[in-house]
C-alpha cells in the first residue's frame, strides 16, 4: 500500500510539473506575441553618415527607435555572401536590426568596400579579411565620434566573425562586447580563388537557403517571402 501510494504521488508530482512547464511555455508565447506586435508598431529612424577610407566611400547607417538617443551602440558586421541589408530584412519579424533597436540599441550597419552601397573597388580580389577589418575599425571610430560614447558592442556573422575578430584584436580599446554567430571555425579554406567577387547573382544568393535533394529551395522550411527579399537584393553585393 505504501509503495502504491508513493508511486501515485510520484505520478501526480510529474503531472503537476508538466502542467507548470506548459503554463510557462504558453505565457512565454503570449509575451513573445505581445512583444512582436509592439515591435511591428514601433517607428524607426534611419540615418546615413558619410565615411571614407583609402579613397573609397563606405556606406554607414544608423537605425534607432524614432525620437530616442540610445546610449548603447552596436555595430553589425556582415559576411561574405551578402551586404549589410541582411540585418534589416523588413518583413514580418525577420529584421535583427529592428529587434535590437526596439530593445534600446542604436544599431549601426556598414558595407565593406565593394559591397552593397559602398563604392566599388577596382580590384575584385580585395577586400580580404585584413582590409575588411580596417573598414570595420573606420566605421567604429565614426560611430564613437557621432555618439560620444567610449566603447561599442560588435556582432559579426559568418565571414563577419573573422573580420570583426581581427578588428577587435587590433583595437580592443573601442569595444565593450564582441558576439560571434555562425563563425568560420576552420578559416576560409585552401581553395584557390580565380574569379573576383565583383557581383552577386540570384543563384548565389539562393544557395544559402535549405534545399531539397534535387537542389531546389525547400519551401516547406523556408518562407518564400524571405527568399524573394534576399534574391531581389542580391545586387547589393
Residue ranges and their predicted role:
Residues 17-30:
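Bacterial N-terminal signal peptides
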Residues 39-67:
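N-terminal cap/lid segment of alpha/beta-hydrolase-fold proteins
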Residues 70-79:
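Short beta-strand element of the alpha/beta-hydrolase
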Residues 80-91:
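Short substrate-entry loop that stabilizes the transition state in hydrolases
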Residues 94-119:
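Conserved alpha/beta-hydrolase
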Residues 133-151:
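Conserved acidic catalytic loop of the alpha/beta-hydrolase fold
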Residues 150-188:
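Conserved hydrolase catalytic core segment
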Residues 193-237:
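Alpha/beta-hydrolase
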Amino acid at each position: 500500500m505504501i509503495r502504491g501510494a508513493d508511486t501515485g504521488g510520484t505520478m501526480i508530482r510529474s503531472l503537476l510539473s508538466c502542467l507548470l512547464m506548459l503554463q510557462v511555455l504558453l505565457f512565454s508565447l503570449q509575451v513573445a506575441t505581445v512583444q512582436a506586435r509592439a515591435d511591428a508598431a514601433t517607428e524607426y529612424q534611419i540615418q546615413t553618415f558619410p565615411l571614407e577610407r583609402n579613397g573609397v566611400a563606405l556606406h554607414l547607417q544608423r537605425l534607432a527607435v524614432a525620437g530616442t538617443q540610445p546610449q548603447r551602440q552596436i555595430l553589425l558586421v556582415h559576411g561574405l555572401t551578402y551586404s549589410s541589408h541582411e540585418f534589416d530584412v523588413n518583413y514580418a519579424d525577420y529584421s535583427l536590426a529592428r529587434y535590437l533597436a526596439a530593445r534600446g540599441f542604436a544599431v549601426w550597419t556598414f558595407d565593406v568596400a565593394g559591397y552593397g552601397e559602398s563604392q566599388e573597388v577596382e580590384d575584385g580580389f580585395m577586400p580580404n579579411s585584413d582590409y575588411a577589418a580596417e573598414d570595420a575599425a573606420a566605421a567604429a571610430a565614426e560611430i564613437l565620434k557621432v555618439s560620444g560614447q567610449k566603447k561599442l558592442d560588435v556582432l559579426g556573422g559568418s565571414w563577419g566573425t573573422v573580420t570583426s575578430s581581427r578588428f577587435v584584436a587590433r583595437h580592443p580599446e573601442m569595444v565593450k562586447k564582441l558576439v560571434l554567430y555562425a563563425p568560420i571555425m576552420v578559416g576560409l579554406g585552401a581553395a584557390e580563388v580565380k574569379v573576383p567577387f565583383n557581383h552577386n547573382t540570384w543563384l548565389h544568393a539562393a544557395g544559402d537557403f535549405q534545399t531539397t535533394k534535387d537542389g531546389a529551395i525547400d519551401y516547406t522550411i523556408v518562407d518564400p517571402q524571405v527568399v524573394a527579399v534576399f534574391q531581389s537584393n542580391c545586387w547589393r553585393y
